[in-house]
Swiss-Prot record:
Its cofactor is Zn(2+). This is Chaperone protein DnaJ. CXXCXGXG motif repeats lie at residues 147-154, 164-171, 186-193, 200-207. Zn(2+) 1 binds at residues 147, 150, 200, 203. Gene3D superfamilies: DnaJ domain, Heat shock protein DnaJ, cysteine-rich domain, Urease metallochaperone UreE, N-terminal domain. Participates actively in the response to hyperosmotic and heat shock by preventing the aggregation of stress-denatured proteins and by disaggregating proteins, also in an autonomous, DnaK-independent fashion. Unfolded proteins bind initially to DnaJ; upon interaction with the DnaJ-bound protein, DnaK hydrolyzes its bound ATP, resulting in the formation of a stable complex. GrpE releases ADP from DnaK; ATP binding to DnaK triggers the release of the substrate protein, thus completing the reaction cycle. GO terms for biological process: chaperone cofactor-dependent protein refolding; DNA replication; protein refolding; response to heat. It comes from the Bacteria. A zinc finger (CR-type) spans 134-212. CDD domains: DnaJ, DnaJ_C, DnaJ_zf.
Length: 372
């Protein structure tokens, strides 16, 4: 290591207080720490230098010797770390062991808490009639399920994993390079802290396997487009004893040829005869549940008029109430090619009557104008 000035390395003056030295070291240590600069040899060397400077300048006796005699006065420079623990004690004063993956000096056993499986999505198409009455929908999908041979342990004969002998269960390996301690992922257990001695032949040691799942999903009546139904525990299987994820079934309602839906209300269009529109009467239509209902058509109904049928729409979710059905009337015009002789005669008579009525109205209008 080059003999650089310790004060310059920490970017402080020679009269700096111990608090200023600590603050400067913390800033530089964070900047150059190997965990923040993986593979950067220059940063690693810089980290070693600022740590060596701090070890001397934070000790009043070593600092006094350094100020008077230079590096020789500080007992040969950076000699203070006789074990891997010495470096950790200094660095943990600042960061609480926040770097290096968290394995403690006592090599505490790595937590083997299970990992939950992923949630899954399934898109289900149903008819409007299905949404009206509610159904039990059979679905099937392929996902990772718990291996039934090893019961999810990954070991042959359902034998559970054992603690890794290389890292003693921590999942991390610490090596001492002079005064500097480097911590890396254990290459034996790949950071798991445990190993499977004899892997299950069916799942290859993963504890899971790909398989088809067949279940029945309850779709409640009144469900709307885009709504989702959650089935707990039917997602991807977890690992290391972790719980399975959930399955979310998203509902898509197929386009209906007759009814359009707006929440719990239904809308439809019904053609009626011109005479019915003029004289009024009743029409029979079929509702979404297949029942026939009578709809009253008032006299003088115009095209586009909406007739409301109360509580003949879709059911509300988790309720016995229903929305309304709106029937939009389309008044049909007469097709001259399909008229009978009698119908033509009646229309001519109607035309003569209308002309006479118009003539009387015109004469009355002009007589009023003349009087003025």
């Amino acid at each position: 290591m080059s003999k650089k000035d310790y004060y310059d390395l920490l970017e402080v003056g020679r009269n700096a207080s111990i608090d200023e030295i600590k603050k400067a070291y913390k800033k530089l240590a964070l900047r150059y720490h190997p965990d923040r600069n993986p593979g950067n040899q220059e940063a690693e060397e810089k980290f070693k230098e600022v740590t060596a400077a701090y070890e001397v300048l934070s000790d009043s006796e070593k600092r006094a010797g350094y100020d008077r005699y230079g590096h020789e006065g500080a007992s040969g420079g950076f000699q203070g770390f006789s074990s891997a623990g010495d470096f950790s004690d200094i660095f943990n004063d600042f960061f609480g062991g926040g770097f290096g993956g968290g394995a403690s000096r006592s090599r505490a056993k790595r937590s083997t808490t299970g990992v939950s499986g992923a949630d899954l999505r399934y898109d289900l198409e149903i008819t409007l009639e299905d949404a009206f009455k509610g159904i039990q929908a059979p679905i099937h999908y392929v996902t990772n399920v718990k291996c039934d041979t090893c019961q999810g342990t990954g070991g042959e004969g359902a034998i559970k994993p054992v603690q890794c002998h290389t890292c003693q269960g921590s999942g991390r390996i610490r090596t001492q390079q002079g005064f500097f301690t480097i911590e890396r992922t254990c290459t034996t257990c790949y950071g798991e802290g445990e190993i499977i001695q004899n892997k299950c032949k069916k799942c290859g040691g993963s504890g899971r396997r790909r398989d088809e799942v067949n279940i029945s999903v309850s779709i409640p009546k009144g469900i709307e487009e885009g709504a989702k139904v959650r089935i707990s525990g039917k997602g991807e299987a977890g690992t290391k004893g972790g719980k399975s994820g959930d399955l979310y079934v998203y509902v898509k309602i197929i386009f209906h040829k007759i009814f359009a839906r707006n929440k719990a209300d239904l809308h439809c269009k019904v053609p009626i005869r011109m005479t019915l529109a003029v004289l009024g009467g009743e029409i029979d239509i079929q509702s979404i549940d297949g029942a026939k209902i009578k709809v009253k058509v008032p006299e003088g109904t115009q095209t586009g008029t909406k007739l409301r049928c109360r509580e003949k729409g879709m059911p509300y979710m988790n309720s016995h109430a229903r929305g309304d059905l709106y029937v939009q009337v389309i008044v049909e015009t007469l097709n001259p090619k399909n008229l009978t002789k009698k119908q033509i005669e009646l229309l001519k008579a109607l035309e003569e009557e209308e002309n006479a009525s118009v003539q009387q109205q015109s004469e009355g209008f002009f007589s009023k104008v003349k009087k003025k």
